[in-house]
Amino acid sequence: MELPRLENVDLSGKRVFLRVDFNVPIENGKVTDKTRIEKTLPTIELLIKKGARIIIASHLGRPKGQTNPEFSLAPVVEVFKGLVKSNVYFSKTVIGDEPIKLSKELRDGEILVIENVRFHKEEEENEPGFSKKLAALADVYVNDAFGAAHRAHASTEGIAHLLPAYAGLLMHKEIVELSALLAKPARPFVAIIGGSKVSSKIKVLNNLFDKVNHLLIGGGMAYTFLKSRAVPVGNSLVEKDFEVQAFQLIEKAGVAGVDLQLPVDHIIGDQFNEKAKTKSVDKMGILDGWMGMDIGSKTVSNYEKIIKNAGTIFWNGPMGVFEMDKFAGGTMAIAKAISKSKAKTVVGGGDSIAAINKAKVADKITHISTGGGASLEFMEGRKLPGVEALKKKVSE
């Protein structure tokens, strides 16, 4: 996939509108994981080296088109300032007099971060007038926000048609790594898919069947699969509307010659919180009044053996209720198993990345994808609007 590249473009003295994905987790006003900020630093450092005047834009959370202090980028900017050596300024508004004035005052290599673009409903509506107001801040557009590339929004798609547009280094790396994963994976190719809902993973599971050798299922979605096979799942999360599709996926795996693995034992809880009583149960099923909260030790062992012999691994989604420590064991075990593998490893999705970081094995992973939904949609074989807008620039 050919994308317009930054490396050979003269950007000295030019204002560059850089769309990044600074949609990071924040608790009590503090950034708790700065992975997405760090991942875009190579592009920012390249722009600084080229003497560009950088205007950074990002979304944060879902403020529903209204100004909401809870979703302000201010705490993100404070973290960002500690990661770059250039002067960093912050505009408390997205469009209007303040960002226009500040963008014109920038010197070569300096950075202006504008407020959360989703404070304006026109952003998600991809409203042409709003795109023009964003474009008025700059001479050149660079998209490094792979995590938002599946959205046809003003700052990810609309603006790309109004300025000379290029892919950032992270955007390019994401596309190269994920394309290779689908086109020429080393065998055996193992996909580990977790998370709470089958409904959000149906399409990617279907698209992976003709590409993978092993499909390992975990997380809450596993219980819809097990229920479809008449395994007692107690009070576990089950999407009743997707039981038939889950059963069809199991059958499809058999026809395609894909080894689809489901949990054979579980860590269960009597309530969905940290105070829950816990016990381990085997494949005979889960008792009424109890719910599956994590994969058990036998399942971990089964999955570890398959991971050890893999040539390529793609992991998206936790194996249990990872945010609760007593149910994080399965996810952490998978993170460590993947880190020990000699395979090419690609990890995507917030909880999976959090587990990799918590296990302190990020340096052992070939590629950590910053795109949760975007990487899934790419793996589904879908076109990403933010990427398509850049591809059009190559053909023009």
UniProtKB/Swiss-Prot annotation:
Which reactions does this protein catalyse? (2R)-3-phosphoglycerate + ATP = (2R)-3-phospho-glyceroyl phosphate + ADP
Where in or outside the cell is it found?
Answer: Cytoplasm
Q: Which UniProt keywords apply?
A: ATP-binding, Cytoplasm, Glycolysis, Kinase, Nucleotide-binding, Transferase
One CC-aspect GO term: cytosol
- Primary subcellular site in the record, as a coarse category: cytoplasm
**Example of a GO biological process term:** glycolytic process
Q: Which Gene3D superfamilies is this protein grouped with?
A: Phosphoglycerate kinase, N-terminal domain
Pathway annotation from the record:
Carbohydrate degradation; glycolysis; pyruvate from D-glyceraldehyde 3-phosphate: step 2/5
Binding sites annotated in the UniProt record for substrate? 21-23, 36, 59-62, 118, 151
Q: Which PROSITE patterns match?
A: PGLYCERATE_KINASE
Cite the Pfam families for this sequence: PGK
Single GO molecular function? ADP binding
Q: Which InterPro entries match?
A: Phosphoglycerate_kinase (IPR001576), Phosphoglycerate_kinase_CS (IPR015911), Phosphoglycerate_kinase_N (IPR015824), Phosphoglycerate_kinase_sf (IPR036043)
Q: What EC designation does it have?
A: 2.7.2.3
Alphabetical list of HAMAP family matching this protein:
Phosphoglyc_kinase (MF_00145)
Q: How does it assemble?
A: Monomer.
- Family note: Belongs to the phosphoglycerate kinase family.
Name used for this protein in its record: Phosphoglycerate kinase
Q: What is the lineage of its organism?
A: Bacteria, Pseudomonadati, Spirochaetota, Spirochaetia, Leptospirales
